[in-house]
Each structure stands twice: as structure tokens, then as C-alpha cells.
């Protein structure tokens, strides 16, 4: 039991400096601090300055105080207050204490602890005022007097430092402020480094072109399908022996394109309102073949699906296999040249008809 009483009455050391006796309790930080460290910690910013703090009990030196007894000249917590004033001594003069915020000056702490301070003359320091304190009071409150004097030195040092910075920041009264034009002249000429030359770039950029409008060296007109659907190189000599066979102006659509190619259709409209749906199969190698105008394009892998031809006038579908309309990469050079020549003649004839 004796050991417990000794532990409860042990003086708490400041948790910040570990040197002085703790006299202040911060509720937000749950920390015991001395006066100097209390000012340093809670003057760092405005948020820390809002922390509620109170003085530690002078009796148990452990709990935050709630009342000051002027007869005992002590700050007391709830338990110590009941212990001292639970009997007939309840007539003692007491005053309830409230928590404080911010960073009070050292003189306010001196007044709170009951020391007489000369308020009329601010030039008189606390050290000069404390010289008039009785030796008995100095012995009893020597630790708090030391902390108050140390706090005053810190606050005076900070005030002198801030005033010197203010004086250095103020311009000389003999020096006129510069005009805005002169201030711009004094700035380093670093704007030239930010100039970027875009002359090497072409005026018409092709970065936004779609996949179907890619620029091919074989297609001077930069179009994927320049001729009509009839101009595609068809193996008329080998497969389509009937010279009267022609593809009419009809709508060409791929049925089951999602099942066949695994992608959504991307229609491209030409002059005859023909829609060509195509997709590249990523799981197979893409093979190149020659078209009627000798342009290498990519062909999807042949499949067993059907192509439905439906005229705009009639709704009777004609189903043909893909072998009916197919490209023949195995043609000889002479046959291909004949096909190209015939197609050029057809094209020239159409151009003349349009001009007429």
C-alpha cells in the first residue's frame, strides 16, 4: 500500500524534453508537458493551438486539475478536492478552472500561480518582479518560477526574431519601388527556352485517320475502295464463263458476321450504296492477295458461311457460296494483265459517260 502511494505522488516529467517537471496536461495529445515545451508544441500551427490544456494537480501531480484553492494555494483534481474539502473545510475559497488554448504569455501563467506582477510598467521583466518574492515562496514554487522565466526568455527571443525579419523585409524609405516594366526587365530571360519549333510538322496530320483511311503507297488517291464493286478482279475466265454475268446494283451484306468474324460490322458506303463488312481474324495469319488495281490488302480466312444477295426491288434472296465470287491469286501474269486492262477500259468509259 505504501508503494502505491509513493508511485501516485511521483512527479511526472515532461514527455517532450524529458528534463523539466510536467505542469500542463494536453487533452488532445494526452501528454504531460512543461510550460516551455507546451508553448513550442502548440505554437507550431493554428490547429495545434486549439488543443485544450489544463494544469496538473499540485497534490497528486498526476490528474488534471479542476479547481484552485486559494487557502491551500494549490491546483486540485476531483479526487484531491474531495479529499481536502470533503469535511468541514468546505468554506475555503475556491475557483473552478477552465481549459485554455493558444499560447498565453508568461505573465499570465505567473498571475495564475499567484505571483505578483507589475502590470503598470511592461518594461519590467518577470525576473525583476520575482526578486521581490519572499524566499519561502521561492522555495515552495521554485520549479514553476524557473519554468515561467524560461518561457519568458523563449517568447522574447521569438518576438525579437520576428521583428528583425519584419525590419529586413521592409524596403528602405529612400528606395522607391520599381515600376512593373523595370521588374520585368530584371527577370532572367528564360522565355526563349520555351519556344518550340513546329515547322517540321506537316499541316495535315494523319494521326486521327481511321484504319480504313490508311495511306497506302499503292493507292495514290488514299482510298481503300475507289472503284465500284464490279471493278474487283473476278476470275471471269476460269470460274465465271458466262460473259453476261454481272453483279447488279444490289445491297451486299454478310449474314452471321458476328459468328463468322467475331466483331461488329463497320460499314463503308461508296457511290453505289454498297456496304462492305470486314473483320480481321487475330487467331490466324493474314494473307495478302492482289486486287484488280494491284493493291495488297488483307483477306480474312475463307469460311463456309453464305453471302445473301437481295435486290431492292424484290425480296427473293439468292444464296451463293463464297466460291462463286472469289479472288484468284493463282492467275498467270498475262491473264492478270488482261483483266487489269479490261477494267481500265471500263473505268475510262464510265468517266467519259459522266463527262458527257
Curated annotation (Swiss-Prot):
The keyword ATP-binding does not apply. Its main location: nucleus. Residues 159-178 are annotated as: Disordered. CDD domains: Bbox1_BBX-like. Keywords: Metal-binding, Nucleus, Repeat, Zinc, Zinc-finger. Zn(2+) 1 binds at residues 14, 17, 37, 42. This is Putative zinc finger protein At1g68190. GO terms for cellular component: nucleus. The keyword Transcription regulation does not apply. Belongs to the CONSTANS family. Zn(2+) 2 binds at residues 57, 60, 80, 85. A zinc finger (B box-type) spans 14-56, 57-97.
